Amino acid sequence: MKIIRVQDQLEGGKVAFSLLKESLAEGATTLGLATGSTPITFYQELVNSDLDCSALTSINLDEYVGLPVENDQSYDYFMRDQLFNAKPFKESFLPNGLADDLEAEVKRYDQVIAEHPIDFQILGIGRNGHIGFNEPGTSFAEKTHVVDLQASTIEANSRFFASIDDVPKQAISMGIASIMASKMIVLLAFGKEKAAAIKGMVSGPVTEALPASVLQQHDNVVVIIDEAAASELD
């Protein structure tokens, strides 16, 4: 696990984008993408670059259950707004949170991942150590699955909604085993509220109680953090 300390989120996005360019030069064609506030500066770098994404495939980590794609809090909307409208990809996959049969959708998404192995995966990390929507206690062997979101995650995401009652209670998430199958993983974290999770991820025991700790077992992980997120590291 390589750790790169940066001044702020802006620099973090630039560093992540430079790593992406290196991966693309080495033949990467499939990107695993994340949502939320953490990767926004990475997407801004991508949008403002001259990079042509028309031959690339993207696979998103997760999507809320029950939100229409036109809802501005759906991850489908987020990805179009932050990236795809400006930089169309050859193919862009997200879980369908409106599927009538969620278990069938889970199987479909596992098939998508199997057919498009991820070369470069962007991750954030939750305060409780979640990656994707893989909450504490999720099996490291889990593939795509329907998640009941923990209260801490619902509370953290409520800032994006009019009321905490509007936050979806479930999501479809790529599993930890799916994430670990990526060739390269770049995890971004900024702010003091992520410091405890970063410490556990980097130097704590590998435990399903802190999902991100499994990244210690991956042979190509780069962690990009600001000083606040790094503040509990030795």
Swiss-Prot record:
PROSITE patterns: GLC_GALNAC_ISOMERASE (PS01161). SUPFAM superfamilies: NagB/RpiA/CoA transferase-like (SSF100950). GO terms for cellular component: cytoplasm. The active site is at D62 (proton acceptor), N128 (for ring-opening step), H130 (proton acceptor), E135 (for ring-opening step). Its EC number is 3.5.99.6. One of its GO terms (molecular function) is identical protein binding. Keywords: Carbohydrate metabolism, Hydrolase. InterPro entries: Glc/Gal-6P_isomerase, Glucosamine6P_isomerase, Glucosamine6P_isomerase_CS, NagB/RpiA_transferase-like. It catalyses: alpha-D-glucosamine 6-phosphate + H2O = beta-D-fructose 6-phosphate + NH4(+). GO terms for biological process: carbohydrate metabolic process; glucosamine catabolic process; N-acetylglucosamine catabolic process; N-acetylneuraminate catabolic process. Pathway: Amino-sugar metabolism; N-acetylneuraminate degradation; D-fructose 6-phosphate from N-acetylneuraminate: step 5/5. It is an enzyme of class 3 (hydrolase). PANTHER family: GLUCOSAMINE-6-PHOSPHATE ISOMERASE. Belongs to the glucosamine/galactosamine-6-phosphate isomerase family. NagB subfamily. NCBIfam families: nagB. Catalyzes the reversible isomerization-deamination of glucosamine 6-phosphate (GlcN6P) to form fructose 6-phosphate (Fru6P) and ammonium ion. This is Glucosamine-6-phosphate deaminase. It comes from Streptococcus equi subsp. zooepidemicus (strain MGCS10565). The gene is nagB.
